[in-house]
Amino acid sequence: MQSAKFKSVNNKVDFVQLEHEMLAKWEKHTIFDRLRKKNKGGEPWSFLDGPITANNPMGVHHAWGRTLKDIFQRYHAMQGHELRYQNGFDCQGLWVEIEVEKELGFKSKRDVQEFGLEKFVNACKDRVHKYSDIQTEQSKRLGYWMDWDNSYFTMSDENNYTIWAFLKKLFNDDK
């Protein structure tokens, strides 16, 4: 019996280079856009990405979660479903505020008042935008397909007004 011969492979694979080559190939051939076009009009399947907080670069646990979410979306895309691919960023105040307070060297909430509430809120928003950009690039490097130009932010006026309207309705309905 003759044994099978396999082509030699390099045992020092540059995975980062391979990753960049694959991402460049997808971009060059507009693979994601072609998939969306192919599935347009298919049965809708919606997946709301439970957002990670845009407060620091992604951790390995975020990458793991995003990879699992991507598997579900790719499966449904392969079934011909039309997907929204909407990414989100959680802008919850507490964790962002804590990091901004550290950056500014604040020791108490009184420091925030002295600094100025509006300036502090703007510093928090700037941090969210900085890290949402970083997380977007990290997610793209994972091969995570999303409509990156239409990500939602929990700090958006639309989101806040919707929450306030909902809370008002609950209050008015006495529930």
Regions found by a protein language model. Name each.
Residues 2-175:
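N-terminal, positively charged nucleic-acid-binding surface of large information/translation enzymes
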